[in-house]
């Protein structure tokens, strides 16, 4: 069985969220923070986490900083600990979008 989740994030909204004192550390892992150089990257990772939770069908039932989006040597994203999954993150204009597919 396949489960699919998709999320879209307005990059300017992420920019405002990143201005809040504790937002970054409550949502992103240290590895993700080190990886991100632009607001667009944070927005893409956030969208991937939301898409993952939608695919799981559980809603936001955990701290987002306990989910880690990793990248291989070619830059392909994946979810740490979710072997049966595929992740796609894209940016266009004012938006970042992510789709996650989980399978059993």
Please report, for each region that a protein language model flagged, where it lies by residue.
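Core catalytic alpha/beta fold that binds nucleotide/phospho-ligands
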Residues: 1-104
